[in-house]
């Protein structure tokens, strides 16, 4: 469910309430959601989750992802150090939290050396901005 496109904020909060009440504690999103090609909506799902999460942060394991272009500049996408550092701060702000439990590279970035990506993610763990780093949509 990409909140902010398929359903409005009120319905999104109701879905999240229902899930939490049913025992669902893992919330997974991405900085690009809702991914519908409307630049003004980029990050809106994180905004909605952040507003919902007030007073509930300790009750959820929060995961989000980065990689897709979120702006017009060439560094606003991919798994480069610059994009990772900018993206995590943007996600933390939208999610209204001090840390992300699981921060994932959304897709492989064949242009950026993996050491650069892993080094930036390791720095975020050391800074306390993320607890764990992961990847999504990578081939086996």
Task: Give the ranges of each region predicted by the language model.
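Active-site-proximal beta-strand elements of phosphoester/diester hydrolases
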Residues: 1, 64, 102
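N-terminal binding-site loop/beta-alpha segment at the start of enzyme catalytic domains
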Residues: 1-60, 98, 126
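Tryptophan-centered motif/residue detector
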Residues: 3, 52, 67, 107-108
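Conserved catalytic core of Hanks-type protein kinase domains
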Residues: 19, 65, 94
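Structural detector of well-ordered beta-strand residues that form the stable sheet scaffold
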Residues: 27, 63, 131-134
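Active-site alpha/beta core segments
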Residues: 53, 65, 75
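A short, structured active-site edge motif that brings together acidic residues
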Residues: 59-70
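Glycine/proline-rich, positively charged
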Residues: 69-140
């Amino acid at each position: 469910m990409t909140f902010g496109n398929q359903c409005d904020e009120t319905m999104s909060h109701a879905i999240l309430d229902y899930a939490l009440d049913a025992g669902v504690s893992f919330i997974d999103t991405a900085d690009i959601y809702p991914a519908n090609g409307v630049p003004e909506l980029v990050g809106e799902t994180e905004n909605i989750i952040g507003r919902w999460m007030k007073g509930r942060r300790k009750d959820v394991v929060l995961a989000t992802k980065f990689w897709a272009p979120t702006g017009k500049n060439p560094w606003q996408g991919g798994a480069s150090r610059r994009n990772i550092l900018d993206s995590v701060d943007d996600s933390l702000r939208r999610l209204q939290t001090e840390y992300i439990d699981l921060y994932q590279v959304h897709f492989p970035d064949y242009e950026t050396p993996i050491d650069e990506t892993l080094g930036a993610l390791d720095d975020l763990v050391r800074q306390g901005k993320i607890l764990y780093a992961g990847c999504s949509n990578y081939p086996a």
